Swiss-Prot record:
Protein's UniProt name: SET and MYND domain-containing protein DDB_G0288495
Top-level taxon in the UniProt lineage: Eukaryota
Ranges for region Disordered: 204-234
Keyword S-adenosyl-L-methionine tagged: yes
Cited function: Probable methyltransferase.
Source organism of this protein record: Dictyostelium discoideum (Social amoeba)
Residue ranges of domain SET in the record: 25-448
Length: 532
Protein backbone atom coordinates (compact mmCIF):
# COMPACT_ATOMS: atom_id res chain seq x y z
CA UNK A 1 0.00 0.00 0.00
CA UNK A 2 1.13 3.58 -0.62
CA UNK A 3 0.89 6.53 1.78
CA UNK A 4 1.69 10.10 0.80
CA UNK A 5 3.13 13.15 2.45
CA UNK A 6 1.54 16.55 2.96
CA UNK A 7 4.02 19.26 3.90
CA UNK A 8 1.65 22.15 4.58
CA UNK A 9 0.40 23.58 7.87
CA UNK A 10 -1.75 21.25 9.90
CA UNK A 11 -4.20 24.15 10.36
CA UNK A 12 -5.59 23.30 6.91
CA UNK A 13 -7.57 20.50 8.53
CA UNK A 14 -9.72 20.36 11.62
CA UNK A 15 -8.45 17.63 13.95
CA UNK A 16 -11.53 15.90 15.36
CA UNK A 17 -11.31 12.88 17.57
CA UNK A 18 -11.86 10.54 14.63
CA UNK A 19 -9.69 7.58 15.54
CA UNK A 20 -12.64 5.46 16.71
CA UNK A 21 -15.07 4.06 14.14
CA UNK A 22 -17.79 3.74 16.80
CA UNK A 23 -17.91 7.51 17.34
CA UNK A 24 -16.70 8.74 13.95
CA UNK A 25 -19.16 11.33 12.58
CA UNK A 26 -18.22 10.68 8.95
CA UNK A 27 -17.68 6.99 8.27
CA UNK A 28 -18.66 3.47 9.28
CA UNK A 29 -17.60 -0.09 8.47
CA UNK A 30 -19.91 -2.45 6.58
CA UNK A 31 -19.57 -6.01 5.35
CA UNK A 32 -20.11 -6.39 1.61
CA UNK A 33 -20.64 -9.71 -0.14
CA UNK A 34 -17.51 -10.92 -2.01
CA UNK A 35 -15.53 -7.88 -0.75
CA UNK A 36 -15.59 -8.26 3.02
CA UNK A 37 -15.10 -5.28 5.31
CA UNK A 38 -15.44 -1.86 3.64
CA UNK A 39 -15.56 1.77 4.79
CA UNK A 40 -18.63 3.81 3.80
CA UNK A 41 -19.77 7.39 4.39
CA UNK A 42 -22.54 8.03 6.91
CA UNK A 43 -23.45 11.30 5.23
CA UNK A 44 -22.23 13.74 2.60
CA UNK A 45 -18.51 14.50 3.10
CA UNK A 46 -16.99 17.62 1.48
CA UNK A 47 -13.63 17.34 -0.27
CA UNK A 48 -10.65 18.21 1.88
CA UNK A 49 -12.16 16.64 5.02
CA UNK A 50 -10.01 14.64 7.41
CA UNK A 51 -12.25 11.66 8.13
CA UNK A 52 -9.98 9.24 9.98
CA UNK A 53 -6.61 8.91 11.73
CA UNK A 54 -4.68 5.84 12.83
CA UNK A 55 -1.37 5.12 14.54
CA UNK A 56 0.83 2.17 13.59
CA UNK A 57 1.02 -1.07 15.50
CA UNK A 58 4.65 -1.31 14.37
CA UNK A 59 6.90 0.64 12.02
CA UNK A 60 10.46 0.35 10.74
CA UNK A 61 12.90 2.33 8.63
CA UNK A 62 13.81 0.31 5.56
CA UNK A 63 17.27 -1.24 5.59
CA UNK A 64 18.74 0.98 2.86
CA UNK A 65 17.72 4.18 4.71
CA UNK A 66 18.66 3.15 8.24
CA UNK A 67 21.54 5.69 8.32
CA UNK A 68 19.38 8.45 6.85
CA UNK A 69 16.22 8.47 8.97
CA UNK A 70 15.47 8.52 12.68
CA UNK A 71 13.83 5.31 13.90
CA UNK A 72 11.49 7.20 16.25
CA UNK A 73 10.34 10.36 14.46
CA UNK A 74 11.27 9.34 10.89
CA UNK A 75 12.93 12.71 10.43
CA UNK A 76 15.75 13.00 7.90
CA UNK A 77 19.13 12.91 9.69
CA UNK A 78 20.54 16.27 8.66
CA UNK A 79 24.30 16.64 8.48
CA UNK A 80 24.15 19.79 10.62
CA UNK A 81 22.78 17.66 13.47
CA UNK A 82 25.27 14.79 13.23
CA UNK A 83 26.70 15.49 16.69
CA UNK A 84 23.33 14.41 18.15
CA UNK A 85 23.07 11.12 16.24
CA UNK A 86 22.64 7.99 18.36
CA UNK A 87 23.17 4.38 17.22
CA UNK A 88 22.32 1.13 18.97
CA UNK A 89 25.70 -0.06 20.37
CA UNK A 90 24.74 -3.74 20.09
CA UNK A 91 23.32 -4.32 16.61
CA UNK A 92 24.46 -1.04 14.96
CA UNK A 93 21.36 -1.26 12.76
CA UNK A 94 19.08 1.30 14.47
CA UNK A 95 19.73 5.06 14.45
CA UNK A 96 18.20 8.10 16.14
CA UNK A 97 18.41 11.82 15.44
CA UNK A 98 18.90 12.58 19.16
CA UNK A 99 19.16 11.04 22.59
CA UNK A 100 15.64 12.30 23.22
CA UNK A 101 14.24 10.21 20.36
CA UNK A 102 16.18 7.21 21.63
CA UNK A 103 14.55 7.51 25.06
CA UNK A 104 11.19 8.81 23.82
CA UNK A 105 10.60 5.96 21.36
CA UNK A 106 7.00 4.75 21.53
CA UNK A 107 6.03 1.11 21.59
CA UNK A 108 5.48 0.90 17.81
CA UNK A 109 9.11 1.87 17.15
CA UNK A 110 10.69 0.72 20.43
CA UNK A 111 13.92 -1.21 19.93
CA UNK A 112 13.72 -3.96 22.55
CA UNK A 113 16.60 -6.18 23.67
CA UNK A 114 14.96 -9.21 22.06
CA UNK A 115 14.54 -7.46 18.73
CA UNK A 116 18.16 -6.29 18.97
CA UNK A 117 19.35 -9.88 19.42
CA UNK A 118 17.23 -11.10 16.52
CA UNK A 119 18.50 -8.31 14.26
CA UNK A 120 22.08 -9.26 15.10
CA UNK A 121 21.40 -12.90 14.17
CA UNK A 122 19.58 -11.87 11.01
CA UNK A 123 22.35 -9.48 9.96
CA UNK A 124 25.10 -12.07 10.43
CA UNK A 125 23.37 -15.11 8.93
CA UNK A 126 20.62 -14.14 6.51
CA UNK A 127 20.48 -10.48 5.48
CA UNK A 128 23.20 -10.79 2.87
CA UNK A 129 21.32 -13.71 1.30
CA UNK A 130 18.01 -11.89 0.84
CA UNK A 131 16.60 -9.32 -1.58
CA UNK A 132 15.93 -5.83 -0.21
CA UNK A 133 12.12 -6.13 -0.02
CA UNK A 134 12.38 -9.47 1.77
CA UNK A 135 14.86 -8.06 4.29
CA UNK A 136 12.45 -5.30 5.23
CA UNK A 137 9.42 -7.51 5.73
CA UNK A 138 11.51 -9.84 7.92
CA UNK A 139 12.56 -6.85 10.06
CA UNK A 140 8.94 -5.71 10.35
CA UNK A 141 7.75 -9.18 11.41
CA UNK A 142 10.57 -9.44 13.97
CA UNK A 143 9.59 -6.07 15.47
CA UNK A 144 5.96 -7.20 15.79
CA UNK A 145 6.93 -10.47 17.46
CA UNK A 146 9.34 -8.66 19.80
CA UNK A 147 6.63 -6.17 20.80
CA UNK A 148 4.11 -8.93 21.54
CA UNK A 149 6.59 -10.85 23.68
CA UNK A 150 7.61 -7.63 25.45
CA UNK A 151 3.94 -6.93 26.25
CA UNK A 152 3.26 -10.59 27.10
CA UNK A 153 0.68 -10.88 24.31
CA UNK A 154 -0.19 -14.05 22.44
CA UNK A 155 2.08 -15.02 19.56
CA UNK A 156 -0.46 -17.41 18.05
CA UNK A 157 -1.72 -16.13 14.70
CA UNK A 158 -2.81 -19.41 13.14
CA UNK A 159 -5.53 -21.54 14.71
CA UNK A 160 -4.46 -24.89 16.11
CA UNK A 161 -4.56 -27.71 13.54
CA UNK A 162 -7.75 -29.76 13.54
CA UNK A 163 -6.13 -32.35 11.31
CA UNK A 164 -2.71 -33.51 10.22
CA UNK A 165 -3.57 -32.36 6.68
CA UNK A 166 -1.97 -28.95 6.12
CA UNK A 167 -4.42 -27.95 3.38
CA UNK A 168 -7.47 -28.79 5.51
CA UNK A 169 -6.00 -26.97 8.49
CA UNK A 170 -5.34 -23.74 6.61
CA UNK A 171 -8.70 -23.68 4.83
CA UNK A 172 -10.84 -24.72 7.80
CA UNK A 173 -13.75 -22.62 9.02
CA UNK A 174 -11.68 -21.60 12.04
CA UNK A 175 -9.51 -19.50 9.72
CA UNK A 176 -12.46 -18.14 7.70
CA UNK A 177 -12.27 -14.38 7.09
CA UNK A 178 -16.01 -14.13 7.79
CA UNK A 179 -15.21 -14.86 11.44
CA UNK A 180 -12.90 -11.85 11.78
CA UNK A 181 -14.25 -8.95 13.87
CA UNK A 182 -15.71 -6.01 11.97
CA UNK A 183 -13.04 -3.65 13.37
CA UNK A 184 -9.46 -5.01 13.62
CA UNK A 185 -7.98 -4.21 17.02
CA UNK A 186 -5.07 -6.65 16.97
CA UNK A 187 -2.77 -8.34 14.47
CA UNK A 188 -4.79 -11.62 14.35
CA UNK A 189 -7.82 -9.55 13.23
CA UNK A 190 -6.12 -8.62 9.94
CA UNK A 191 -7.04 -10.38 6.73
CA UNK A 192 -4.43 -12.52 4.97
CA UNK A 193 -4.29 -14.52 1.75
CA UNK A 194 -2.70 -17.68 3.10
CA UNK A 195 -5.83 -19.75 2.46
CA UNK A 196 -5.93 -18.45 -1.11
CA UNK A 197 -2.32 -19.49 -1.64
CA UNK A 198 -3.04 -23.01 -0.39
CA UNK A 199 -6.19 -23.34 -2.50
CA UNK A 200 -4.43 -22.01 -5.60
CA UNK A 201 -1.56 -24.42 -5.06
CA UNK A 202 -3.98 -27.36 -4.93
CA UNK A 203 -6.43 -26.23 -7.61
CA UNK A 204 -3.66 -25.24 -9.99
CA UNK A 205 -2.52 -28.87 -10.23
CA UNK A 206 -6.11 -30.01 -10.83
CA UNK A 207 -6.57 -27.28 -13.43
CA UNK A 208 -3.52 -28.45 -15.37
CA UNK A 209 -4.67 -32.10 -15.28
CA UNK A 210 -8.10 -31.11 -16.59
CA UNK A 211 -6.45 -29.03 -19.30
CA UNK A 212 -4.37 -32.01 -20.46
CA UNK A 213 -7.52 -34.14 -20.68
CA UNK A 214 -9.29 -31.42 -22.68
CA UNK A 215 -6.37 -31.22 -25.10
CA UNK A 216 -6.45 -34.99 -25.64
CA UNK A 217 -10.19 -34.88 -26.32
CA UNK A 218 -9.75 -31.94 -28.69
CA UNK A 219 -7.03 -33.77 -30.61
CA UNK A 220 -9.22 -36.85 -30.86
CA UNK A 221 -12.17 -34.74 -32.01
CA UNK A 222 -10.05 -32.94 -34.57
CA UNK A 223 -8.96 -36.28 -36.04
CA UNK A 224 -12.55 -37.41 -36.45
CA UNK A 225 -13.53 -34.06 -37.88
CA UNK A 226 -10.80 -34.24 -40.53
CA UNK A 227 -12.30 -37.47 -41.80
CA UNK A 228 -15.84 -36.08 -42.07
CA UNK A 229 -15.38 -32.38 -42.60
CA UNK A 230 -17.18 -30.55 -45.41
CA UNK A 231 -17.49 -26.95 -46.51
CA UNK A 232 -20.55 -26.30 -44.35
CA UNK A 233 -18.79 -27.50 -41.18
CA UNK A 234 -15.73 -25.39 -42.00
CA UNK A 235 -17.88 -22.25 -42.03
CA UNK A 236 -19.30 -23.11 -38.59
CA UNK A 237 -15.80 -23.64 -37.23
CA UNK A 238 -14.70 -20.22 -38.48
CA UNK A 239 -17.57 -18.54 -36.64
CA UNK A 240 -16.41 -20.13 -33.37
CA UNK A 241 -12.80 -19.02 -33.71
CA UNK A 242 -13.32 -15.69 -31.92
CA UNK A 243 -15.07 -17.33 -28.96
CA UNK A 244 -12.38 -20.00 -28.72
CA UNK A 245 -9.63 -17.35 -28.86
CA UNK A 246 -11.25 -15.42 -25.99
CA UNK A 247 -11.50 -18.58 -23.91
CA UNK A 248 -7.87 -19.42 -24.60
CA UNK A 249 -6.76 -15.93 -23.57
CA UNK A 250 -8.67 -16.25 -20.31
CA UNK A 251 -7.13 -19.66 -19.64
CA UNK A 252 -3.64 -18.34 -20.36
CA UNK A 253 -4.24 -15.41 -18.01
CA UNK A 254 -5.34 -17.77 -15.24
CA UNK A 255 -2.33 -20.03 -15.81
CA UNK A 256 0.05 -17.05 -15.77
CA UNK A 257 -1.12 -15.72 -12.41
CA UNK A 258 -1.38 -19.21 -10.93
CA UNK A 259 2.33 -19.65 -11.60
CA UNK A 260 3.13 -16.19 -10.20
CA UNK A 261 1.19 -16.97 -7.02
CA UNK A 262 2.84 -20.37 -6.63
CA UNK A 263 6.33 -18.86 -6.96
CA UNK A 264 5.36 -16.14 -4.50
CA UNK A 265 3.98 -18.74 -2.11
CA UNK A 266 7.25 -20.66 -2.14
CA UNK A 267 9.15 -17.44 -1.43
CA UNK A 268 6.87 -16.63 1.52
CA UNK A 269 7.27 -20.12 2.96
CA UNK A 270 11.05 -19.80 2.86
CA UNK A 271 10.95 -16.32 4.42
CA UNK A 272 8.75 -17.73 7.19
CA UNK A 273 11.28 -20.50 7.77
CA UNK A 274 14.06 -17.91 8.06
CA UNK A 275 12.04 -16.04 10.70
CA UNK A 276 11.31 -19.30 12.51
CA UNK A 277 15.03 -20.13 12.64
CA UNK A 278 15.91 -16.67 14.01
CA UNK A 279 13.40 -16.78 16.86
CA UNK A 280 14.07 -20.44 17.74
CA UNK A 281 16.13 -20.42 20.94
CA UNK A 282 16.95 -24.12 20.57
CA UNK A 283 19.33 -23.45 17.65
CA UNK A 284 22.79 -22.72 19.05
CA UNK A 285 24.43 -21.48 15.86
CA UNK A 286 22.99 -19.86 12.74
CA UNK A 287 26.24 -20.00 10.82
CA UNK A 288 26.26 -21.71 7.43
CA UNK A 289 22.45 -21.88 7.24
CA UNK A 290 21.51 -21.18 3.64
CA UNK A 291 18.34 -19.62 2.27
CA UNK A 292 16.63 -21.74 -0.32
CA UNK A 293 14.76 -19.67 -2.87
CA UNK A 294 14.96 -16.36 -4.69
CA UNK A 295 17.77 -14.96 -2.58
CA UNK A 296 21.17 -13.36 -3.14
CA UNK A 297 24.23 -15.43 -4.00
CA UNK A 298 27.81 -15.01 -2.75
CA UNK A 299 28.55 -12.45 -5.46
CA UNK A 300 25.61 -10.28 -4.38
CA UNK A 301 23.45 -11.15 -7.37
CA UNK A 302 19.77 -11.85 -6.78
CA UNK A 303 18.60 -15.23 -8.00
CA UNK A 304 16.40 -14.81 -11.07
CA UNK A 305 13.07 -16.56 -10.55
CA UNK A 306 11.10 -17.42 -13.67
CA UNK A 307 7.46 -16.79 -12.73
CA UNK A 308 6.29 -18.31 -16.01
CA UNK A 309 7.06 -21.82 -14.79
CA UNK A 310 6.01 -23.75 -11.70
CA UNK A 311 8.48 -23.60 -8.79
CA UNK A 312 10.22 -26.85 -7.94
CA UNK A 313 9.61 -28.48 -4.60
CA UNK A 314 6.55 -26.45 -3.55
CA UNK A 315 4.42 -29.52 -2.77
CA UNK A 316 7.15 -30.94 -0.55
CA UNK A 317 7.55 -27.61 1.26
CA UNK A 318 3.82 -27.44 1.95
CA UNK A 319 3.64 -31.03 3.17
CA UNK A 320 6.53 -30.47 5.59
CA UNK A 321 5.16 -27.31 7.20
CA UNK A 322 4.98 -27.63 10.97
CA UNK A 323 2.38 -25.90 13.13
CA UNK A 324 5.05 -23.33 14.09
CA UNK A 325 5.83 -22.72 10.42
CA UNK A 326 2.13 -22.23 9.68
CA UNK A 327 1.82 -19.77 12.54
CA UNK A 328 4.69 -17.59 11.31
CA UNK A 329 3.50 -17.94 7.72
CA UNK A 330 0.04 -16.72 8.75
CA UNK A 331 1.60 -13.68 10.45
CA UNK A 332 3.83 -13.01 7.45
CA UNK A 333 0.83 -13.07 5.09
CA UNK A 334 -1.12 -10.72 7.35
CA UNK A 335 1.73 -8.22 7.38
CA UNK A 336 2.38 -8.46 3.67
CA UNK A 337 -1.28 -7.85 2.81
CA UNK A 338 -1.71 -4.87 5.13
CA UNK A 339 1.49 -2.87 5.60
CA UNK A 340 1.73 0.74 4.40
CA UNK A 341 4.72 2.38 2.80
CA UNK A 342 6.17 5.40 4.62
CA UNK A 343 7.42 7.94 2.11
CA UNK A 344 9.85 10.82 2.44
CA UNK A 345 11.66 13.45 0.39
CA UNK A 346 14.41 12.19 -1.89
CA UNK A 347 17.87 12.92 -0.46
CA UNK A 348 21.27 11.48 -1.17
CA UNK A 349 21.49 8.32 0.99
CA UNK A 350 24.45 7.55 3.25
CA UNK A 351 26.36 4.41 2.18
CA UNK A 352 25.36 1.42 4.29
CA UNK A 353 28.87 0.27 5.20
CA UNK A 354 29.96 3.10 7.49
CA UNK A 355 30.21 6.86 7.93
CA UNK A 356 33.64 8.42 7.81
CA UNK A 357 33.69 11.71 9.71
CA UNK A 358 36.49 13.00 7.51
CA UNK A 359 34.93 11.94 4.22
CA UNK A 360 32.65 14.72 3.09
CA UNK A 361 31.57 12.73 0.05
CA UNK A 362 29.63 10.43 2.36
CA UNK A 363 27.92 13.23 4.28
CA UNK A 364 24.17 13.09 4.03
CA UNK A 365 21.59 15.69 3.06
CA UNK A 366 23.84 18.52 1.89
CA UNK A 367 21.70 18.76 -1.21
CA UNK A 368 18.15 20.02 -1.41
CA UNK A 369 15.46 17.39 -1.92
CA UNK A 370 14.42 16.84 -5.50
CA UNK A 371 10.86 16.53 -6.75
CA UNK A 372 10.52 12.89 -5.88
CA UNK A 373 9.57 10.67 -2.97
CA UNK A 374 11.22 7.53 -1.71
CA UNK A 375 9.74 4.56 0.09
CA UNK A 376 11.81 4.86 3.27
CA UNK A 377 9.93 2.63 5.69
CA UNK A 378 6.96 0.39 6.42
CA UNK A 379 4.23 0.31 9.03
CA UNK A 380 1.26 -1.85 9.98
CA UNK A 381 -1.92 0.14 10.67
CA UNK A 382 -4.73 -2.04 11.96
CA UNK A 383 -7.77 0.09 11.15
CA UNK A 384 -6.39 1.67 7.98
CA UNK A 385 -6.33 -1.84 6.53
CA UNK A 386 -10.13 -1.57 6.16
CA UNK A 387 -9.84 0.95 3.31
CA UNK A 388 -10.03 -0.73 -0.08
CA UNK A 389 -8.25 0.15 -3.32
CA UNK A 390 -9.24 2.16 -6.36
CA UNK A 391 -7.14 3.29 -9.32
CA UNK A 392 -8.93 6.65 -9.05
CA UNK A 393 -9.41 6.94 -5.27
CA UNK A 394 -11.60 9.51 -3.55
CA UNK A 395 -9.25 9.68 -0.54
CA UNK A 396 -5.53 9.88 0.15
CA UNK A 397 -3.26 9.14 3.11
CA UNK A 398 -1.07 11.77 4.80
CA UNK A 399 1.66 11.14 7.38
CA UNK A 400 1.88 13.29 10.50
CA UNK A 401 5.67 13.70 10.51
CA UNK A 402 5.40 15.40 7.13
CA UNK A 403 2.51 17.65 8.15
CA UNK A 404 4.66 18.99 11.01
CA UNK A 405 7.95 18.88 9.11
CA UNK A 406 8.49 22.64 9.27
CA UNK A 407 8.20 22.71 13.06
CA UNK A 408 10.34 19.63 13.62
CA UNK A 409 13.15 20.83 11.36
CA UNK A 410 13.49 23.98 13.45
CA UNK A 411 14.54 21.88 16.45
CA UNK A 412 17.65 20.29 15.04
CA UNK A 413 19.96 22.36 17.22
CA UNK A 414 18.31 21.77 20.55
CA UNK A 415 21.16 19.76 22.08
CA UNK A 416 19.41 16.52 21.27
CA UNK A 417 16.29 17.28 23.29
CA UNK A 418 13.76 17.23 20.50
CA UNK A 419 10.58 17.36 22.55
CA UNK A 420 8.65 19.49 20.07
CA UNK A 421 6.30 16.61 19.26
CA UNK A 422 4.61 16.42 22.65
CA UNK A 423 2.11 13.59 22.63
CA UNK A 424 1.65 13.68 18.85
CA UNK A 425 2.58 10.42 17.19
CA UNK A 426 4.68 11.38 14.19
CA UNK A 427 3.69 8.20 12.34
CA UNK A 428 -0.04 8.92 12.50
CA UNK A 429 -1.65 8.53 9.07
CA UNK A 430 -4.72 10.60 8.23
CA UNK A 431 -7.34 9.92 5.56
CA UNK A 432 -8.29 13.05 3.56
CA UNK A 433 -11.11 13.17 1.00
CA UNK A 434 -9.99 14.27 -2.47
CA UNK A 435 -13.50 14.83 -3.83
CA UNK A 436 -17.00 15.31 -2.47
CA UNK A 437 -18.35 11.96 -1.26
CA UNK A 438 -22.06 11.24 -1.23
CA UNK A 439 -23.89 9.43 1.56
CA UNK A 440 -23.38 5.64 1.60
CA UNK A 441 -20.44 5.80 -0.83
CA UNK A 442 -17.31 3.71 -0.24
CA UNK A 443 -14.13 5.54 0.72
CA UNK A 444 -11.16 4.29 -1.29
CA UNK A 445 -7.39 4.80 -1.29
CA UNK A 446 -4.69 3.45 -3.58
CA UNK A 447 -2.30 0.58 -2.93
CA UNK A 448 -0.05 1.28 -5.94
CA UNK A 449 1.40 4.17 -7.99
CA UNK A 450 -1.42 5.39 -10.24
CA UNK A 451 0.65 6.69 -13.16
CA UNK A 452 0.72 3.23 -14.76
CA UNK A 453 -1.11 1.70 -17.70
CA UNK A 454 -3.98 -0.63 -16.90
CA UNK A 455 -2.02 -3.81 -17.68
CA UNK A 456 0.72 -2.85 -15.22
CA UNK A 457 -1.80 -1.94 -12.52
CA UNK A 458 -3.70 -5.21 -12.99
CA UNK A 459 -0.49 -7.24 -12.78
CA UNK A 460 0.68 -5.46 -9.63
CA UNK A 461 -2.65 -5.85 -7.81
CA UNK A 462 -3.24 -9.46 -8.82
CA UNK A 463 0.34 -10.48 -8.06
CA UNK A 464 0.60 -8.86 -4.62
CA UNK A 465 -2.97 -8.67 -3.31
CA UNK A 466 -4.56 -11.49 -5.33
CA UNK A 467 -7.57 -9.54 -6.58
CA UNK A 468 -8.84 -8.23 -9.89
CA UNK A 469 -9.51 -4.49 -9.65
CA UNK A 470 -13.05 -3.61 -10.75
CA UNK A 471 -12.89 0.16 -10.21
CA UNK A 472 -14.43 2.52 -12.76
CA UNK A 473 -11.08 3.58 -14.15
CA UNK A 474 -10.10 -0.01 -14.94
CA UNK A 475 -13.57 -0.71 -16.33
CA UNK A 476 -13.45 2.14 -18.83
CA UNK A 477 -9.79 1.65 -19.75
CA UNK A 478 -10.49 -1.95 -20.73
CA UNK A 479 -12.85 -0.56 -23.36
CA UNK A 480 -10.69 2.39 -24.36
CA UNK A 481 -7.33 2.96 -22.68
CA UNK A 482 -7.49 6.72 -23.31
CA UNK A 483 -11.06 7.23 -22.09
CA UNK A 484 -10.07 8.31 -18.57
CA UNK A 485 -6.73 9.93 -19.38
CA UNK A 486 -7.99 13.54 -19.38
CA UNK A 487 -9.82 13.48 -16.05
CA UNK A 488 -6.93 11.64 -14.39
CA UNK A 489 -4.36 14.17 -15.64
CA UNK A 490 -6.63 17.10 -14.68
CA UNK A 491 -6.67 15.73 -11.12
CA UNK A 492 -2.85 15.52 -10.90
CA UNK A 493 0.03 17.95 -10.64
CA UNK A 494 0.97 19.22 -14.11
CA UNK A 495 4.61 19.92 -13.25
CA UNK A 496 6.56 17.68 -15.64
CA UNK A 497 9.46 17.36 -13.17
CA UNK A 498 7.20 16.27 -10.34
CA UNK A 499 5.89 12.88 -9.24
CA UNK A 500 3.29 14.22 -6.85
CA UNK A 501 0.24 12.47 -8.24
CA UNK A 502 -3.30 13.47 -7.29
CA UNK A 503 -3.86 17.00 -5.96
CA UNK A 504 -5.01 17.45 -2.36
CA UNK A 505 -7.63 20.13 -1.54
CA UNK A 506 -6.04 23.00 0.41
CA UNK A 507 -8.88 22.90 2.92
CA UNK A 508 -12.45 21.70 3.24
CA UNK A 509 -14.56 22.69 0.19
CA UNK A 510 -11.54 24.38 -1.42
CA UNK A 511 -11.47 24.85 -5.19
CA UNK A 512 -7.66 24.77 -5.09
CA UNK A 513 -5.48 21.70 -4.75
CA UNK A 514 -1.83 21.41 -3.69
CA UNK A 515 0.82 19.05 -5.00
CA UNK A 516 2.30 17.05 -2.14
CA UNK A 517 5.78 17.23 -3.71
CA UNK A 518 6.47 20.55 -5.44
CA UNK A 519 3.84 22.48 -3.39
CA UNK A 520 2.38 24.10 -6.52
CA UNK A 521 -1.35 24.86 -6.37
CA UNK A 522 -3.86 24.32 -9.15
CA UNK A 523 -7.59 24.67 -9.68
CA UNK A 524 -9.29 21.38 -8.92
CA UNK A 525 -11.51 19.83 -11.61
CA UNK A 526 -15.27 19.89 -11.03
CA UNK A 527 -16.31 17.31 -13.63
CA UNK A 528 -15.16 13.72 -13.20
CA UNK A 529 -17.09 11.95 -15.94
CA UNK A 530 -16.93 9.03 -16.58
CA UNK A 531 -15.25 8.25 -13.23
CA UNK A 532 -17.76 9.98 -10.96
Amino acid sequence: MISYEYCDSSDSFYFNDIQDFDFNPWIEVKSVSEKGRCVFSKKFIPKGTMVFRDIPYAAIVDNQFKRNICTTCFKILLESNRHNFQTCPSCFQVNYCSNYCKQYSKIETKHTELECKWIQDFTVSFKHQMAEDDRNIVLLVLKILARRIHEKQSTIFHNKPLTTNTFETCTSNNNNIDLLPMIPNDIPDLIDHLDDYFINSKNNNEFENEEEEEEEQEQKGEGEQEENENNENNEKVKKKVIIIDDNEKEKEEIKKFNKIWKNDFKRLINIAKVIQIIIDDSIDSLENIKCDYGFVDNQGDTEMVDNSIDPKGLDKLVDNLSSSDLNILRLLCKIRANYFGLWNSAYKPIPLNSIDDDDDDNNNNKEKPNNDYLWCGSGVYLKLSLFNHSCFPNCTTLIEYNINKKNSNNNNGNNGNNNSYGDTNQLTISIITLRDIEENQELLITYIPLNQKINDRVKSLKSNWLFQCDCKRCHFEKINENQTEKIYKDSCCTNQKCSGGLLIPLEQNSTQGICRVCKNTYTLPTVFYPLK
